[in-house]
Amino acid sequence: MGNHLTEMAPTASSFLPHFQALHVVVIGLDSAGKTSLLYRLKFKEFVQSVPTKGFNTEKIRVPLGGSRGITFQVWDVGGQEKLRPLWRSYTRRTDGLVFVVDAAEAERLEEAKVELHRISRASDNQGVPVLVLANKQDQPGALSAAEVEKRLAVRELAAATLTHVQGCSAVDGLGLQQGLERLYEMILKRKKAARGGKKRR
């Protein structure tokens, strides 16, 4: 499994006539459920996966309310500690970051917080929209999206960084549609702002 893509449909697709695909990178600690989320999006079913040693990539088309779909090139990068220094190689020039956390494993949220802040503050990622997926909401004791947002100190990310925290589950697909809609909206907003800034110069 790997080297594919899934597409999404836009709410304002007419604004993006020139994009073949939006580049999105999925990162997070090991065992957070990144690959399972990727394949839930692609195959619309839960796929039990093994730890990612490098990366997976899929083209994903997801209806976001518009009549025309938008293709997302989604890169899922391994989260083991030894692989984390490689994240920046994948996030360079990305349109959006998806940071996945295991909401049922509260003891690792501090570690996740450190990695989230490190990657979002990297020079190449300044201002890139961040969608945090609080995965495994199907498990007993999973923290809510609001609690995950608080523990990760998401609001302390750079003021120019658009963020959204969404509870979700790779098992039943809960919350994924809403999360992707918000990510798409944030990407659109950033591109519009960038275009407006160029016109004013």
Swiss-Prot record:
Originating organism: Homo sapiens (Human)
Gene: ARL4D
Function: Small GTP-binding protein which cycles between an inactive GDP-bound and an active GTP-bound form, and the rate of cycling is regulated by guanine nucleotide exchange factors (GEF) and GTPase-activating proteins (GAP). GTP-binding protein that does not act as an allosteric activator of the cholera toxin catalytic subunit. Recruits CYTH1, CYTH2, CYTH3 and CYTH4 to the plasma membrane in GDP-bound form.
Claim: Plastid is one of the keywords in the record: no
Compartmental location: Nucleus, Nucleolus; Cell membrane; Nucleus; Cytoplasm
Record SMART domains: ARF, RAB, RAS, SAR
Pfam families assigned: Arf
PROSITE patterns (UniProt xref): ARF
Protein name: ADP-ribosylation factor-like protein 4D
GO molecular function per UniProt: GTP binding; GTPase activity
Main location: nucleus
